[in-house]
Amino acid sequence: WDWSTAGDDEREEATHEYLKIKGSFVYEKNLKPEFVWYNGHADRYLLGDPVAEEGITALNPPKGDIRDPEAKIWPFKVHRAMQPYDTENRYLMQPVTAGEGGFWREFNWDQAIQLGSEVTGMDYSGEFGFAATSMYWPQTHMVAPKEQALQCKACHCERGCIDWEAIGYPGDPLKWGSRNRIHREDLAGAGEQR
């Protein structure tokens, strides 16, 4: 969802692609989730926290990694967006969208951000841009019935649905061994036939 494209009078509206009040967005069907380690806890972006200097500001990154014995591999849908932020103070801003002076009436980001700063009590330098953000949504609803659950080979095959290297394995753990073995041996000899 790209708020930076909102307010464009020249762009044609399309319900699932662009709305003047919201900007552009992409809907996907049968979206393949992203798999990450998750121990049931997450960090949270709090109003006033700095945005990432480079890259993406994660609003609620799941906690856990391959070395965390409490963590399990979880599927997440990751919502990516471009959101307004104060370029001098380097934090996300909460614009007023509805009502008098709101963005949806005036289509003026500077004014909407200024009004939002008055509501939140945050300083606004008068300089804004749009920062890349991500929000992790655990896939715990709208999940297929158990009869349609993935079988082992959906992940443990050459083109499986999990990117093993992205979550800390040197390859498929069926070949390389469990996370305990991998870290116990510090990857020395992992994956070799014994």
Regions found by a protein language model. Name each.
Residues 1-150, 157-194:
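Primarily the internal scaffold of c-type cytochrome electron-transfer domains
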